[in-house]
UniProtKB/Swiss-Prot annotation:
GO terms for molecular function: hexose transmembrane transporter activity. Alpha-D-glucose binds at residues 166, 301-302, 307, 408. Keywords: Cell membrane, Disulfide bond, Membrane, Sugar transport, Transmembrane, Transmembrane helix, Transport. This is Hexose transporter 1. Inhibited by cytochalasin B. InterPro entries: GLUT (IPR045263), MFS_dom (IPR020846), MFS_sugar_transport-like (IPR005828), MFS_trans_sf (IPR036259), Sugar/inositol_transpt (IPR003663), Sugar_transporter_CS (IPR005829). Disulfide bonds join 60-67. The chain crosses the membrane at residues 26-46, 76-96, 102-122, 132-152, 167-187, 204-224, 290-310, 328-348, 357-377, 391-411, 426-446, 452-472. It comes from Plasmodium knowlesi. Sodium-independent facilitative hexose transporter. Can transport D-glucose and D-fructose. Can transport D-mannose, D-galactose, D-xylose and D-glucosamine. Active from 32 to 42 degrees Celsius. Retains 50% of its maximal activity at 20 degrees Celsius. GO terms for cellular component: plasma membrane. Belongs to the major facilitator superfamily. Sugar transporter (TC 2.A.1.1) family.
Length: 500
């Protein structure tokens, strides 16, 4: 039982500046979430301006905008972001070791340079290189921002603030598509020159992240100058850690959260001593099994088709809509994606991880399979076209409340502590690699027939449903550092010591 002093201390922490959603901790989190916004923006920015770049750079001189040359180059540009992210995510672990706030400052400075480079490009090779760099920055964000948020947040608000990362990603996607509406319709004839506004605007859209990055630097340099309390404590700066905790909790009495950080640091050190390398884990059947499950689950997420809709919806909608409605519908889709992230905060704890994953996959199958069959029968019917458009929205809703957020929660709950970091990183790497596999040929397949994509995504979602149903276990309510796939006795046998 807690004594009266401990109860008073806990009550003090709850009744001070940490109360409510809007508090000091939130301000630090929002400064980091500007990087999350950059993530979403950079993934989606090409969606609405790709065809205008084709015309200005003359990739299809005398031909249609979707000529073979432009289709191939567009495929490289779309996939290059994900290729860069693979490299960046691998480098991010090294960067955060030098400080969480420091890593955010590096990211913001990096995107200033990338934005300038992209906005002044005049050749395919330079824009391809700049998109690779954008992807590298996105890879850095995937680790740096969630870690900063987790360590700079009141313990009772980690879940609510943690979802802000995903919300700002979807908000960045929305803004990128919204700004693209100003470009208007793509000229009917590829030989028609772009208007002066269009020539300037698509470059300004590439430059826009520079403004957001400068804002992030200003906030972290002049207003939120402290490192996270966990990082400070880890580096032996206990008093500095205590001071920032006072700001986060709105109380001078922070002995309880300081002790929690101390325990976490000690547990982390113990985990490092007891950790099993990924190579060694792959040689042990029980560990290899859970690692493969995580990698397959992660890879299948991309084969639902989410990143084709996020990064290439305009190309997909061309077959179903007139030009003036294409970007408008993409904007509406991104709004739905943004708004439907909110319900996941509540239902993930109510329904559980496995149930949500199954429901999401079932929703995607119900959206895409009938649509694929209908398009196969008569793809010129107005009813079928409306069905195809509706299917993309059902898919977005199904994904946003399930596979989208739940995967990343599950990957940090399914692995035991001794392999969690390396196994989760490998699963994330598989996710990025599968994104490349899916996104790269999407332009080519859409040009051939969107029906093919509908069949692929519905078929893979059926595979994902069956895989989850038969192999994936529920992790809701599980203890931190444990795994439903490996018993304590099995873990102790391979670690050679007690595991708690």
């Amino acid at each position: 039982m807690k004594n009266s002093n401990e109860i008073s201390s806990s009550q003090s922490l709850k009744n001070n500046g940490s109360d409510g959603f809007f508090n000091t901790s939130l301000m630090y989190v929002l400064a980091a979430c500007l990087a999350s916004f950059l993530f979403g923006y950079q993934v989606s920015v090409l969606n609405t301006i790709k065809d205008f770049i084709v015309i200005e750079f003359g990739w299809c001189a005398g031909k249609e905008v979707n000529c073979d040359d432009s289709t191939l180059k567009s495929s490289f540009l779309l996939a290059s972001v994900f290729i860069g992210a693979v490299v960046g995510s691998g480098f991010s672990g090294f960067l955060v070791q030098h400080g969480r706030r420091f890593s955010l400052l590096v990211i913001y400075n990096f995107f200033i340079l990338v934005s300038i480079l992209t906005s002044i490009t005049h050749h395919f090779h330079t824009i391809l290189f700049s998109r690779l760099l954008s992807g590298f920055g996105i890879g850095l964000i995937t680790v740096s921002v969630p870690m900063y948020i987790s360590e700079m947040t009141h313990k009772d608000k980690k879940g609510a603030y943690g979802v802000l990362h995903q919300l700002f990603i979807t908000f960045g996607i929305f803004i990128a598509v919204l700004l693209g509406m100003a470009m208007g319709n793509v000229p009917e004839e590829v030989n028609n020159p772009l208007g002066t506004f269009q020539q300037i605007w698509w470059r300004l859209m590439f430059f826009f992240p520079c403004i957001i990055s400068i804002l992030g630097i200003v906030l972290l340099t002049f207003f939120f100058k402290e490192e996270t309390p966990y990082y400070l404590f880890e580096k032996g700066k206990v008093e500095e850690s205590k001071e920032i905790l006072k700001k986060i909790y709105g109380s001078d009495d922070v002995d309880e959260p300081l002790k929690a950080i101390k325990d976490a640091v000690e547990q982390n050190e113990a985990a490092k001593k007891n950790s099993i390398s990924l190579m060694r884990a792959m040689k042990i059947p029980s560990y290899r099994y859970v690692i493969l499950l995580g990698c397959i689950l992660s890879g299948l997420q991309q084969f639902t088709g989410i990143n084709v809709l996020v990064s290439n919806s305009n190309a997909l909608y061309k077959g179903f809509l007139t030009n003036e409605w294409i970007t408008t519908l993409s904007v509406i889709m991104t709004v739905v994606n943004f708004l439907m992230t909110f319900p996941a905060i509540y239902i993930v704890e109510k329904l559980g991880r496995k149930t949500l994953l199954l429901c999401g996959c079932a929703g995607i199958v119900c959206a895409f399979l009938p649509t694929a069959i209908a398009n196969l029968i008569n793809n010129t019917s107005d009813v079928v076209k409306k069905l195809s458009i509706s299917a993309t929205f059902v898919m977005i809703v199904s994904f946003a409340v399930s596979y989208g957020p739940v995967l990343w929660i599950y990957l940090h709950e399914m692995f035991p502590s001794e392999i969690k970091d390396s196994a989760a990183s490998l699963a994330s790497l598989v996710n990025w690699m599968c994104a490349i596999i899916v996104v790269f040929p999407s332009d080519i397949i859409i040009k051939q027939s969107p029906t093919i994509l509908f069949f692929i995504f519905s078929g893979m979602s059926i595979v994902a449903f069956l895989f989850i149903f038969f192999f994936i276990k529920e992790t809701k309510g599980g203890e931190i550092g444990t795994s439903p796939y490996i018993t304590l006795e099995e873990r102790q046998k391979h670690m050679g010591k007690s595991v708690v």
